[in-house]
Each structure stands twice: as structure tokens, then as C-alpha cells.
Amino acid sequence: GLTNVELTAKVRAKEEKIATAIQAYLKEAGITMNVEVIDNGVWTSSRSEGSLQATIVGWFPLYADADNQMYTYYYSENAVGKGVFYNNPEFDALMTEARQTVGDDAKREELYKQADYILSREDYATIPLYYPKLQFVAKPYVKNAKLGNLVYHLYNIDIDLSKK
């Protein structure tokens, strides 16, 4: 097992509670994680410079596809510009092949699963913690507003103001 592992997570104030919870879980595993709350501007410049050993980033994908979640931030040509600094040629090759796979959804899915395994279980470049629950509230006179997995479907809304 690991011994004498220590890391520092520099986080913004809004992530302090999450970082503190992670700190407690890691302590149980024998890993010391120091939590340092820093100003958002300092955090942003530190991330751009690649000087954050560990941090917490909230990100909500634009659409539910593995490509959007992994290629955008972790493909080596994109990673530095996104403040991630990840580079793994095997991961890149899987991403490239998956992006070029057309008409074979099962093969494409398997390639993304392999890439995800490398990213989150071999290299630990990212450790997804949770997806926040989306809330949607509408008055009774608003009909056909729907909440999908990741997006609001607002294109077919009916509003009957006479029932207001």
C-alpha cells in the first residue's frame, strides 16, 4: 500500500466543504490531504500555470456523450489550454479511434470505456465524484416543460395565462 502520501488541494471557497469531506475519506486510507482555500483569481491563474497539485472543478457537459466529457479536457492537444496538463498517448489513440468510428455504436462505446478506465482508474487524472441533481419548478399553467438527463427541454412549452 501507499505510505507517507501527502498532497495539497487548493480550492475556491465554494468547494471547501467538498474538499474537507474528501480529506476525511483520504485520512481513513492513510493519505494526508491539506486543504488550502484560495481566491478565485489566484485559483484561475494557478490552474492555467499548472501549479495546482489537486483541486476540485465543477463541470456540466453540454450533451450526454463520452466524447464531450473526455476529449474536451483530457485529449493532450486540448489539455494544457484547459488547465489540465494531461498527456497519455494511449488515451489519445483511443479517443481518436472512437471519434472516427461511425456506424458501430458498440465499438465506439467500448473505446470510450477503455479511455475512461485509463483516465479515471489508471492515471487518476480525474475522479468524478457526483452529478448534481437538477431541479425544475413550473407553475401549473406551464405545460410540456421537461427535464432531461442533462438539459432542460423548453422548445415545446405551452403557457396558458388564462389559468394563471
Task: Give the location of each predicted region.
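Short helix-capping segments at alpha-helix termini
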Residues: 1, 27-31
